[in-house]
A protein has these predicted regions:
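Glycine-rich phosphate-binding P-loop
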Residues: 6-20
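Conserved phosphate-donor/acceptor-positioning beta-strand/loop module used by diverse small-molecule
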Residues: 114-134, 143-155
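RNA pseudouridine synthases
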Residues: 95, 105-120
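ATP-dependent small-molecule kinase phosphotransfer cores
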Residues: 40-100
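Short, amphipathic alpha-helical "lid/cap" segments that border enzyme active or binding sites
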Residues: 89, 188-196
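Short beta-strand-centered segment that lines the nucleotide-binding/catalytic pocket of NTP-utilizing
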Residues: 29-40
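Small-molecule kinase domains that catalyze NTP-dependent phosphoryl transfer to phosphate-bearing small molecules
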Residues: 60-65, 142-188
């Protein structure tokens, strides 16, 4: 049985680190930044541009979702963004066929739903998320806790809109995942070990 683990996460929940540690412990592939790099190559766009666009809802005026046909559009001002989404969906399917893997975000739980993945979503209380983000912010970034809280909320809204647009489902809703993990105050390293035991049981 192919071990495909899409990993959704609230911003600042530690979901990215948790997914990476799980991949390391299970000795399977881990995809996050690597997806941005590959999409940039395939679209001839900069990695920075892809990073800004990839988990934001497309600016389009007609419905598109992965469960139905994806229509190409002729309007050149829309094409670069749209190309990112179509290439990303293609790449996620390629990666999942290639090997067992953890894929962070990018609506992978929905896009790869036919492969029967074990879908995980990490969340945490706002206090824990602010603390984590403040501890990991770049040295030249001087946001206050109030400003960080605002950024967290903005990123979460963006991810929720992206997810709803492509899946027509609610981001973070328990019915869309196999396991929801509250990382508030948790030791991510220890938590990853517990989750690996769960995953091994699920994939038997």
């Amino acid at each position: 049985m192919k071990r495909i683990i899409p990993f959704g996460r609230e911003f600042g929940s530690g979901g990215r680190e948790l997914g990476r540690r799980i991949a390391e412990k299970l000795e399977i592939a881990y995809y996050d930044q690597e997806i941005i790099t590959e999409i940039a190559k395939r679209t001839a766009l900069s990695e920075e541009y892809v990073r800004r666009i990839e988990e934001k809802r497309p600016v389009m005026h007609f419905p598109i979702h992965t469960g139905h046909s994806i229509y190409l559009i002729s309007e050149p001002t829309f094409y670069p963004d749209f190309s990112i989404y179509t290439k990303q969906h293609e790449l996620l399917r390629e990666l999942s066929r290639k090997s067992d893997c953890v894929i962070v975000g990018r609506c992978a739980d929905y896009i790869l739903r036919e492969q029967k993945p074990v879908r995980i979503f990490a969340y945490a209380d706002m206090e824990s998320r602010i603390k984590r983000c403040m501890e990991r912010r770049p040295e030249d970034e001087h946001l206050t806790e109030a400003q960080m809280k605002k950024r967290i909320a903005e990123i979460d809204r963006s991810r929720a809109k992206y997810y709803a647009f492509f899946s027509e489902q609610k981001w973070g809703a328990r019915e869309n995942y196999d396991l929801l993990v509250n990382t508030s105050g948790a030791d991510i390293k220890k938590l990853s070990s517990a989750l690996c035991a769960y995953l091994e049981a699920m994939f038997e």
